[in-house]
Amino acid sequence: MIILPAIDLKGGKCVRLYKGDMNSQEVVARDPFETALKFKSEGAQYLHMVDLDGALKGSGENLDIISKIVKNVDVPIEVGGGIRNIETIDKFIKLGVSRVILGTAALKNKELVIKAVENYDEKIAVGIDAKDGVPAADGWTTLSKTNYIDFGKEMEKIGVQTLIFTDISKDGTLEGTNLEQLLKLKNSVKCNVIASGGIKDIEDIKSLKKENVYGAIVGKAIYAKTLSLKKAIEIGGN
């Protein structure tokens, strides 16, 4: 199981949100570049980066920082947040990003997902950020009219190979993942499913590993020191 430490960017700093609320941000590190280097030194196999300004405004507010990390930190990186057209996807892929995450765009523009998968295949992931099983869009401010399982199946049919599932009510809470919803999705599709939101400690990592989940995104737990990244990678990889 791959462990992906998270760097969420807002105003050029690393922040964590509570339950996806943009007004609840806590600055957890002032220098995202140094944070990425630290994660690499601790054995990170992949980095998960989200441009929260972009998620809300639909534009790449933190592109310079992302670019610096991609070019100077020798670890595969996936990036999401505000990526809503093929030009932005092209830009990130050309920059050297290993995987581009579509969220709002996947809910609102299926044609974009089809085109992106045709062009970039496994380099396209879709983030399913759900409230009570309903995918949310526009920086988690609006709810869609579809069920998260149906949406996951629809993305699988298009050819998406990686889904990132977040229960927004768990995000940033350190309360553990919504394992029940996560496993329903995992058992409904053949895609690689990455767990995100709520992971607190090594027991959560062990639970996900036991269920053969493809990956786990860890954020607040690392910054709050309730989870050792090195230990998580050690457990996840064995």
Swiss-Prot record:
Annotated Gene Ontology cellular component terms: cytoplasm
Active site (record annotation): 8, 129
Molecular function via GO: 1-(5-phosphoribosyl)-5-[(5-phosphoribosylamino)methylideneamino]imidazole-4-carboxamide isomerase activity
One family name in Pfam for this protein: His_biosynth
Keywords annotated in UniProt: Amino-acid biosynthesis, Cytoplasm, Histidine biosynthesis, Isomerase
Classification via InterPro entries: Aldolase_TIM, His_biosynth, HisA_bact_arch, Isoase_HisA-like, Isoase_HisA-like_bact, RibuloseP-bd_barrel
Predominant subcellular localization, coarse grouping: cytoplasm
Keyword ATP-binding in annotation: no
Domain of life of the native organism: Bacteria
Entry keyword annotation includes Ligase: no
Catalytically driven reaction(s): 1-(5-phospho-beta-D-ribosyl)-5-[(5-phospho-beta-D-ribosylamino)methylideneamino]imidazole-4-carboxamide = 5-[(5-phospho-1-deoxy-D-ribulos-1-ylimino)methylamino]-1-(5-phospho-beta-D-ribosyl)imidazole-4-carboxamide
Pathway(s) it belongs to: Amino-acid biosynthesis; L-histidine biosynthesis; L-histidine from 5-phospho-alpha-D-ribose 1-diphosphate: step 4/9
Chain segments annotated as transmembrane: none
Coiled coil: none
Enzyme nomenclature, EC number: 5.3.1.16
Localization (cell): Cytoplasm
Gene Ontology biological process terms in this record: L-histidine biosynthetic process; L-tryptophan biosynthetic process
HAMAP family xrefs: HisA (MF_01014)
Family under the similarity heading: Belongs to the HisA/HisF family.
Protein name per Swiss-Prot or TrEMBL: 1-(5-phosphoribosyl)-5-[(5-phosphoribosylamino)methylideneamino] imidazole-4-carboxamide isomerase
Species of origin: Clostridium kluyveri (strain ATCC 8527 / DSM 555 / NBRC 12016 / NCIMB 10680 / K1)
Lineage: Bacteria, Bacillati, Bacillota, Clostridia, Eubacteriales
